[in-house]
Amino acid sequence: MDKHYIYIVKCKDGSLYTGYAKDIEKRIIKHNNGQGAKYTKIRRPVQLVYQEMFDTKSEALKREYEIKTFSRQKKLKLISEG
């Protein structure tokens, strides 16, 4: 069964980016090679600071959407509670 992930990366400028991936390692490499999201392209390098795993893409995308609505402080709390 495939696994699905949501992740948060910390960008060079200190901002946080939340995304979805089936393979986090490959996705982080893409972000750092400028092949990821437009947002991270100009904020490289990025560093993985948080991840969650799900059994279905639907669950992962729902959680990604939820986290994207969080304030920066709420995201930092989530990261620190790991």
Swiss-Prot record:
| SUPFAM superfamilies found in the cross-reference section | GIY-YIG endonuclease
GIY-YIG domain span: 2-77
Kindly indicate where the leader peptide sits in this chain: none
- Domain of life, per the record? Bacteria
Pfam families assigned to the protein according to its UniProt record, in alphabetical order = GIY-YIG
**Which InterPro entries did the record assign?**
GIY-YIG_endonuc, GIY-YIG_endonuc_sf, UPF0213_domain
- Belongs to which family? Belongs to the UPF0213 family.
Record protein name field: UPF0213 protein SSP2268
Organism field: Staphylococcus saprophyticus subsp. saprophyticus (strain ATCC 15305 / DSM 20229 / NCIMB 8711 / NCTC 7292 / S-41)
